[in-house]
């Protein structure tokens, strides 16, 4: 309830007054072109004794005492601590240790400790009119009258109210004046608002027109007292200004508001265009303990007023009033642009008031005007000063300024605002680190470490020692006791931390501090070529007290990961031999204490285990940078730390027994593995990149541990490990190259375990995959897209760059001869869909119970002989019918077979590539071992060669490939496994047959390792083979040169033709007769994929898959097929193994050393930042899990360059038909697999929660999410419909008002115009032979004109009569002075004149009566007849009177003459 009361009393006080201390110009003038906003360009920090001011285009910060001395005296010069050219500043204030400076469009901050750091905090969407700073919150009123609050700590904006004209805020209260002239008051607590009360204008003031008295400003004088200003609206474009304002003191008591008008507070007589704003300085307890004294100034006035909570105070003396000066340039009043109070500076004030000689302290009011001039006046109260009760409360003053006491810096624009999340996460357990927890990380596949793992290394280590924006920037020295972290910088940080270890922006990014004793770890470790940079901290008892941000010099100890804490340095721990600039670059570290639980350079490792190596225990043997070897041995580090040096040695790997250690997959689950599996415990020393292998009785698992290794070269172990008879299975989640039972492949989670279907893993990249890649794709813990943004340099999806494989992929030929008749028979049987198990062909299987006579029966006995030289690698054996086998697992064999043995190798029966998978498995189920699946198939083509090199040492392949290529290769791996199985079988059959003669061929000096194009022979890593290391080196060099030659070829087809011609010329006729086309089917299968050659490039509508099958007899592989040596010297037909070194040729390259240096120096943190920054971000996750595109659909297959085996034309037609049909089947399988992959991906839902945040990226949505998308769209439509309806309603109201006012008037005018137009048309009608009657309007006009004419005629006649009388008087004066008759006539004439008037009046009345009677009697009449008659009669009477008068005069003169 509001009421209007009497005027506020104004007291002329003898006590209150202002003491003028001085005035000087300190800043440039605005020149009357002030920003149209509430200028608050002066602020004083009494606690810091500093001031900030802005005027013109300059902002300054300086010492307050120096400013006062400069103003009050002429001797002290003024210097500033900081100054900057900033145009159109509208707001400055102190905020803790910073200064806020704002224009209408942006907010800036200045660090008082680092005055050079002037940065942009945020930019405003709409121009700003008014700002207030309170409790770390900036309250903003913009040009569209929206009131919002900007949190200076989080930069988040929250809208408070709309249609706001003005507001004022204190620490606990927010007052708002709305455009409808209503008031609202809110309680302000911790940034949250709660409405206290609201009221509107009294009914008496409601009558004031809004156009003239619009709401302008509201000011809080006390919690219950307000000052409101109403007046005319001023525009920024106005040239001349005149203010007409009404001010009211509002007191709100017990739910009712009383309005009292005042005329003496800052009377608005300003002459400069200003945005209306009221400045105030509140002094609490200055005179009375509970009363406020408010010093008020207005942007529209040059006077300063005092309000003492009860009345307006005016000093009695004019000299004691505070008035701004008149401009010397324009002779106009100046007005304030900033007002502040100073209560801390010192200086004696002489004669402040009457009766007081000097005083040391007064509240000094600093007033900055629009010309940059600063005036200082001191507020005094004579009685209080004399009585000693004049109290200046500094604490209440600072509290009233609403400045934040915290020294926390404001986040600047462009910084990642991760601190919002970190404040909550910092107090959580370490397992909730976004890079350690399986539930919170973007890599949801991460496994948790054992809860009881005893580690000396912190589990909360971030990816690079610490997160990007948070706790230690480059290094974290974690305290040795349990501690927690808060949202601000911890005061308990070690005093010896280096500068770089301090928080970058005051807070830890992820806020986790280890709860276990931990040692310091470097964020970026030691330098690029120096001490450990990534991860493994020193595990010795004594941690470094302080460390450099980048550790020791650039050329020192290992760069990526290992730290040495033992007394002795490591024997050999090079990642790539010896590093380029010092000690091992990537290698492992040594620890004299227990192994760390997760001593990752990345905190907890990015993929579940340590990122770049942990310290091993007890011994200091060398280890791989990536843990164990890619295929059972250490990855890259040779025994003597020289990979390519003269001391290159090959040591034999050891196969550790399984110790019930479960190495987790470093990649996310595909969804098939249960969460329990994803959380399974791993060994405390598991690490994806750099474990000290086999230094204790308990082996340490590795996420990239493809086999166990004690030390030595990664290649040597891989080469020597092939001699073992241990086998592997396709489709299992255990790595085929791991020597430990529980060691799962890091890439085993690409696909589901399809062992029941007998197919290869769904993640296989092409038709033929090497064993490593096959098992990399079997793990259930990863999805394809998660591999491309790894924080460990994309080691998850390892692919070498596919060099121009579209053109250079060449066919690998078999080494020895094989009967063309036998191969033709085999092909015909396959084409006829004959069950191979039913044929019992001993050449292709081990089914010894049923042997039938065949041209190949001579080789049956040698097939099943035990051999220690098993082929290096095979894809022929898949996971089909694993359940029907019962051979011991490869891990069990690893315990019992430390060296290569001659035990029997049970080969699988033939898998017919042309039969359905079920038929093949039916014929082979009885011949397969559960884990013994050695196959000697080979892979041809550039793509398969690339894969071989990748799989051989998968952990380093990514060092050479572009990330885009890695993504493409991985996307290809999401295809159906059946096609891979289909492509492998044929080569497997041939490899078995060739194995019988390969050994004899080797003894006879025949070459058994050839490389055609990029084709490489593959070998299983967990099979062992003894061979010469020097031969491996030599073959590595040969292969390196052959790869360079192959990359220079222009096209694949031309190179194949050329090599085919050369091979035909070099080899014997017998070799030419043995080369059969069916051995090259693997080329068809290999090259049919989009990245495997020219085949299947459906770039046009009628695209076809081009199969280039070419035979080259110069370079052969033992694995390309089963060879038969018909010579007599071939007494023992065994499987050839000399092609093994080829497998390593693609990985043993000199480039590794350069890549090592590159990895040491590249800013790897960028990749890590993307993970830390976008952790949990829906858009980021949607991008990572975006749906796969539907691959190209091939319409046909094109087979060219078929190498015919037979010379018979009929057989050649059969061969050509077979090749064509097989190619068409291959194309069909490829299309089916592509569609299956697409449908499977569309059917999955990788993101549990989808909101409107990711609706802009529609390509990341899948079909099952359509309902969610529809709901979101419906919700948006509902919101938009509400807005639209409101707009429509508003428009209807405007239209109604327009119709009611404007349209009604227009309608009336149109009706009148239409009436007149119709009348004119009728009047203008030529057919009318008579004059039309006048309309009513015309008749009125006619009547009016006639009446006026009548009046004019009457006046003329009267004038004539008077002239005649004048003439008579003239005659009388001249001649008739003595004649009494003339005088008598003159008098009588005057009397007759009155009579004439009466006669005229009577006639008019009679005429009117006649007109009325005629109007009643006749419908139409001649309106002018009566008037005409009247006028004629009037003229007759006039003439008669004139004649009579003349006659009388004539008679008079006649008689006079007669008398004479």
From Swiss-Prot:
PTM sites of type Phosphoserine: 404, 657, 724, 735, 745, 805, 819, 889, 940
Chain positions covered by the region annotation Interaction with NUP82: 1223-1460
MF GO annotations: adenyl-nucleotide exchange factor activity; structural constituent of nuclear pore; transcription corepressor activity
Membrane topology designation: Peripheral membrane protein
Main subcellular location of this protein, as a coarse class: nucleus
FXFG repeats: 704-707, 728-731, 873-876
Compositional bias annotation for Low complexity: 683-704
Phosphothreonine: modified positions: 803
Residue windows of the SXFGXPXFG repeats: 462-470, 503-511, 522-530, 548-556, 574-582, 600-608, 624-632
Region annotation Interactions with CRM1 and GLE1: where it falls in the sequence: 497-701
Keyword DNA damage: no
Example of a GO biological process term: nucleocytoplasmic transport
Entry GO CC: nuclear envelope; nuclear membrane; nuclear pore; nuclear pore central transport channel; nuclear pore cytoplasmic filaments; nucleus
Skewed-composition ranges (Polar residues): 536-546, 556-567, 582-593, 607-619, 727-750, 757-767, 778-800, 861-889, 942-958
Renumbered residue ranges of the record's region Interaction with DBP5: 1-500
Listed SUPFAM superfamilies: Nucleoporin domain
Biased composition (Basic and acidic residues): 917-936, 960-1002, 1017-1027, 1035-1061, 1068-1092
Origin: domain of life: Eukaryota
Something else known: Present with 1230 molecules/cell in log phase SD medium.
Subunit structure: Component of the nuclear pore complex (NPC). NPC constitutes the exclusive means of nucleocytoplasmic transport. NPCs allow the passive diffusion of ions and small molecules and the active, nuclear transport receptor-mediated bidirectional transport of macromolecules such as proteins, RNAs, ribonucleoparticles (RNPs), and ribosomal subunits across the nuclear envelope. Due to its 8-fold rotational symmetry, all subunits are present with 8 copies or multiples thereof. Part of the NUP82 subcomplex, interacts with NUP82 through its C-terminal coiled coil.
Function: Functions as a component of the nuclear pore complex (NPC). NPC components, collectively referred to as nucleoporins (NUPs), can play the role of both NPC structural components and of docking or interaction partners for transiently associated nuclear transport factors. Active directional transport is assured by both, a Phe-Gly (FG) repeat affinity gradient for these transport factors across the NPC and a transport cofactor concentration gradient across the nuclear envelope (GSP1 and GSP2 GTPases associated predominantly with GTP in the nucleus, with GDP in the cytoplasm).
Entry domain remark: Contains FG repeats. FG repeats are interaction sites for karyopherins (importins, exportins) and form probably an affinity gradient, guiding the transport proteins unidirectionally with their cargo through the NPC. FG repeat regions are highly flexible and lack ordered secondary structure. The overall conservation of FG repeats regarding exact sequence, spacing, and repeat unit length is limited. FG repeat types and their physico-chemical environment change across the NPC from the nucleoplasmic to the cytoplasmic side: SXFG/PXFG repeats are especially abundant in NUPs on the cytoplasmic side.
Protein name listed in UniProt: Nucleoporin NUP159
Organism: Saccharomyces cerevisiae (strain ATCC 204508 / S288c)
Lineage: Eukaryota, Fungi, Dikarya, Ascomycota, Saccharomycotina
């Amino acid at each position: 309830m509001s009421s209007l009361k009497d005027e506020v009393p104004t007291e002329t006080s003898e006590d209150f007054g202002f003491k003028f201390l001085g005035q000087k110009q300190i800043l440039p003038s605005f020149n009357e072109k002030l920003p149209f906003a509430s200028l608050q360009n002066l602020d004083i920090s009494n606690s810091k004794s500093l001031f900030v001011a802005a005027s013109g285009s300059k902002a300054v910060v300086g010492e307050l005492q120096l400013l006062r001395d400069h103003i009050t005296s002429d001797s002290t010069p003024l210097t500033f601590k900081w100054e900057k050219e900033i145009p159109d500043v509208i707001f400055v204030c102190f905020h803790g240790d910073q200064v806020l400076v704002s224009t209408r469009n942006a907010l800036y901050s200045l660090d008082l400790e680092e005055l050079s750091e002037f940065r942009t905090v945020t930019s405003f969407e709409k121009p700003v009119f008014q700002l207030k700073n309170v409790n770390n919150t900036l309250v903003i009123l913009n040009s569209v009258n929206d009131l919002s609050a900007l949190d200076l700590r989080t930069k988040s904006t929250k809208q408070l109210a709309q249609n706001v004209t003005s507001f004022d805020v204190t620490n606990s209260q927010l007052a708002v004046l709305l455009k409808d002239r209503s008031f609202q008051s809110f309680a302000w607590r911790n940034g949250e608002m709660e409405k206290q009360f609201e009221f509107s204008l009294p009914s008496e003031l409601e009558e004031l027109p809004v156009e003239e008295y619009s709401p302008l400003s509201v000011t809080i004088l006390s919690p219950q007292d307000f000052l409101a200003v109403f007046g005319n609206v001023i525009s920024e474009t106005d040239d001349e200004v005149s203010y007409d304002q009404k001010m009211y003191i509002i007191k709100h008591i017990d739910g009712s508001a009383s309005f009292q008008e005042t005329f003496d507070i800052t009377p608005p007589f300003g002459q400069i265009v200003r945005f209306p704003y009221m400045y105030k300085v509140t002094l609490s307890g200055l005179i009375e303990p509970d009363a406020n004294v408010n010093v008020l100034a207005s942007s529209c006035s040059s006077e300063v007023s005092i309000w003492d909570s009860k009345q307006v105070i005016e000093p009695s003396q004019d000299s004691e009033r505070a008035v701004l000066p008149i401009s010397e340039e324009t002779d106009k009043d100046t007005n304030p642009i900033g007002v502040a109070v100073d209560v801390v500076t010192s200086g004696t004030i002489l004669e402040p008031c009457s009766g007081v000689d000097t005083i040391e302290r007064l509240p000094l009011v600093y007033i900055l005007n629009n010309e940059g001039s600063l005036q200082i006046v001191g507020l005094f109260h004579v009685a209080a000063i004399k009585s000693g009760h004049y109290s200046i409360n500094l604490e209440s003053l600072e509290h009233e300024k609403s400045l934040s006491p915290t020294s926390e810096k404001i986040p600047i624009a462009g910084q990642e605002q991760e601190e919002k999340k970190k404040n909550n996460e910092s107090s959580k357990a370490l397992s909730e680190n976004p890079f350690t927890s399986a539930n919170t990380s973007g890599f949801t596949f991460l496994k948790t470490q054992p809860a009881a793992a005893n580690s000396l290394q912190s589990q909360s280590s971030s990816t690079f020692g610490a997160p990007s924006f948070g706790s230690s920037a480059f290094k974290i020295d974690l305290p040795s006791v349990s501690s927690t972290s808060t949202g601000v910088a911890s005061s308990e940080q070690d005093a010896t931390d280096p500068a770089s270890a301090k928080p970058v922006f005051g807070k830890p990014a992820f806020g986790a501090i280890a709860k276990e004793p931990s040692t310091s770890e470097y964020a970026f470790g030691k330098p690029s070529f120096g001490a450990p940079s990534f991860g493994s901290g020193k595990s010795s008892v004594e941690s470094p007290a302080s460390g450099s941000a980048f550790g020791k010099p650039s050329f020192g100890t290992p760069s990526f990961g290992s730290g040495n804490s033992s007394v002795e340095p490591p024997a050999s721990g090079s990642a790539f031999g010896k590093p380029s600039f010092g000690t091992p670059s990537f290698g492992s570290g040594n620890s004299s204490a227990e192994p760390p639980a997760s001593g990752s350079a990345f905190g907890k490792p990015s993929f579940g285990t340590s990122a770049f190596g942990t310290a091993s225990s007890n011994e200091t043997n060398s280890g791989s940078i990536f843990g164990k070897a890619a295929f059972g041995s250490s990855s890259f580090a040779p025994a003597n730390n020289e990979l390519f040096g003269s001391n290159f040695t090959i040591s034999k790997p050891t196969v550790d027994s399984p110790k019930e250690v479960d190495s987790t997959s470093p990649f996310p689950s595909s969804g098939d593995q249960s969460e329990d599996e994803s959380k399974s415990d791993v060994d405390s020393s598991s690490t994806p990149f750099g474990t000290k292998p086999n230094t204790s009785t308990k082996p340490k698992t590795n996420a990239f541990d493809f086999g166990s290794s004690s030390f030595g070269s990664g290649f040597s172990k891989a080469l020597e490990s092939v001699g073992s008879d241990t086998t592997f299975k396709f489709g299992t989640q255990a790595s085929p190259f791991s020597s430990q039972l529980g060691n799962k492949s890091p890439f085993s989670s690409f696909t589901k375990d399809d062992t029941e279907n007998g197919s290869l893993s769904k993640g296989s990249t092409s038709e033929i995959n090497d064993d490593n890649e096959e098992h990399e794709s079997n793990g259930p813990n990863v999805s394809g897209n998660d591999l491309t943004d790894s924080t460990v340099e994309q080691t998850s999806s390892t692919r070498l760059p596919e060099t121009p494989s579209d053109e250079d992929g060449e066919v690998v030929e078999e080494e020895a001869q094989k009967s063309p008749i036998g191969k033709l028979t085999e092909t015909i049987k396959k084409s006829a869909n004959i069950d191979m198990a039913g044929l019992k062909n001993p050449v292709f299987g081990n089914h010894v119970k049923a042997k039938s006579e065949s041209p190949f029966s001579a080789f049956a006995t040698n097939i099943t002989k035990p051999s220690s030289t098993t082929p290096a690698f095979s894809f022929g054996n898949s996971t089909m019918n694993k359940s029907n086998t019962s051979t011991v697992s490869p891990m069990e064999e690893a315990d019992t077979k430390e060296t290569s043995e001659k035990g029997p190798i049970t080969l699988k029966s033939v898998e017919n590539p042309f039969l359905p998978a079920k038929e093949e498995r039916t014929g082979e189920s009885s011949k397969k071992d559960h884990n013994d699946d050695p196959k000697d198939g080979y892979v041809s083509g550039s793509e398969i060669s690339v894969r071989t090199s990748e799989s051989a040492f998968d952990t380093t392949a990514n060092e050479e490939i572009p990330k885009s290529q890695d993504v493409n290769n991985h996307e290809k791996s999401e295809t159906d496994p059946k096609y891979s199985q289909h492509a492998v079988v044929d080569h497997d059959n041939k490899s078995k047959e060739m194995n019988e003669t390969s050994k004899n061929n080797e003894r006879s000096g025949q070459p058994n390792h050839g490389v055609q194009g990029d084709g490489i022979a593959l070998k299983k890593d967990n099979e062992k083979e003894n061979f010469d290391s020097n031969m491996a080196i030599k073959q590595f060099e040969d292969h390196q040169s052959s790869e360079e030659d192959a990359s220079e070829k222009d096209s694949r087809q031309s190179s194949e033709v050329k090599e085919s011609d050369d091979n035909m010329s070099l080899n014997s006729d017998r070799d030419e007769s043995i080369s059969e086309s069916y051995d090259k089917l693997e080329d068809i299968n290999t090259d049919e994929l989009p990245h495997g050659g020219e085949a299947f490039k459906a770039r046009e509508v009628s695209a076809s898959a081009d199969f280039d099958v070419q035979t080259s007899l110069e370079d052969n592989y033992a694995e390309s097929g089963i060879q038969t040596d018909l010579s007599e010297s071939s007494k023992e037909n065994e499987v050839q193994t000399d092609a093994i070194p080829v497998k390593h040729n693609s990985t043993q390259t000199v480039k590794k050393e350069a890549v090592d240096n590159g990895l040491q120096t590249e800013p790897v943190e960028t990749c890590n930042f993307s993970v830390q920054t976008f952790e949990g971000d829906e858009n980021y996750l949607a991008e990572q899990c975006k749906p796969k595109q539907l691959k190209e659909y091939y319409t046909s297959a094109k087979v060219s360059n078929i190498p015919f085996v037979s010379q018979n034309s009929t057989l050649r037609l059969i061969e050509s038909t077979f090749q064509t049909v097989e190619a068409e089947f291959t194309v069909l399988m490829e299309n089916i697999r592509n569609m299956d992959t697409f449908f499977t991906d569309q059917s999955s839902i990788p993101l549990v929660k989808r909101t409107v945040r990711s609706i802009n990226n529609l390509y990341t949505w899948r079909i099952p999410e359509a309902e969610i998308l529809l709901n979101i769209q419906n919700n948006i439509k509902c919101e938009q419909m509400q807005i639209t309806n409101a707009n429509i309603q508003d428009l209807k109201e405007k239209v109604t008002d327009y119709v009611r006012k404007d349209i009604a008037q227009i309608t009336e005018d149109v009706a009148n115009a239409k009436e007149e137009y119709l009348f004119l048309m009728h009047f203008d009608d030529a057919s009318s032979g008579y004059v039309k009657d006048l309309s009513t309007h015309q008749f009125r006009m006619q009547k009016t004109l006639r009446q006026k004419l009548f009046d004019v005629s009457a006046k003329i006649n009267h004038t004539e009569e008077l002239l005649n009388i004048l003439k008579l008087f003239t005659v009388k004066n001249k001649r008739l002075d003595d004649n009494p008759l003339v005088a008598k006539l003159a008098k009588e004439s005057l009397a007759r004149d009155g009579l004439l008037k009466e006669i005229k009046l009577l006639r008019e009345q009679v005429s009117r009566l006649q007109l009325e009677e005629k109007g009643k009697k006749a419908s139409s009449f001649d309106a002018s007849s009566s008037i005409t008659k009247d006028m004629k009669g009037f003229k007759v009477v006039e003439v008669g009177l004139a004649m009579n008068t003349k006659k009388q005069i004539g008679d008079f003169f006649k008689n006079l003459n007669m008398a004479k």
